[in-house]
A protein has these predicted regions:
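Enzymes that bind and transform nitrogen-containing heteroaromatic metabolites
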Residues: 1-147
Length: 147
């Protein structure tokens, strides 16, 4: 029986797949938030990420759903921004993995726990950020499903 893919997960990583250092995000950029808003109408996030999206400087039409462990509550077909949770337990539910790369190395003690080589890269876009010269957005789909 084929497993059903149900959500689109969005993450930000550095060159070493780092996501956090000492329980703090490595970096942020308003252009990433605006790009996420162009992809999704509704976004599930944890309270940890709320300030990134509920900010007077960021004007989006996103409907924000804030929940502890948002990835476990995200509705089918929805988008979920993840900064401080492991993805491995949810990999069978991820239809697309949208990865923003800072193209820099930062200190990190919490890293992406999925191997991107096991996913099929379907799109790569580079764009200038507000505080980063170049940000890369990559979109992956699971190889094993052929989706």
């Amino acid at each position: 029986m084929r497993k059903v893919k149900t959500m689109n997960v969005i993450i930000c990583i550095d060159e070493n797949q780092g996501m956090l250092f000492n329980n703090r995000r490595q970096s942020k950029d308003i252009k990433v938030i605006e790009d996420i808003a162009s992809l999704a109408k509704e976004l599930w996030i944890s309270p940890f990420s709320e300030k990134l999206f509920i900010d007077e400087k960021v004007k989006t039409n996103l409907v924000i759903q804030v929940r502890d462990n948002a990835i476990s509550h995200a509705a089918e077909g929805s988008y979920c921004f993840v900064e401080n949770e492991k993805l491995m337990p949810y990999q069978d539910k991820i239809e697309q993995l949208i990865v923003y790369k800072w193209n820099r190395s930062y200190p990190s003690d919490f890293k992406l726990d999925l191997n991107l080589n096991e996913w099929k890269l379907i799109e790569t876009i580079d764009f200038a950020g507000n505080s980063h010269e170049k940000i890369t957005r990559e979109i992956y789909k699971g190889k094993q499903t052929g989706i």
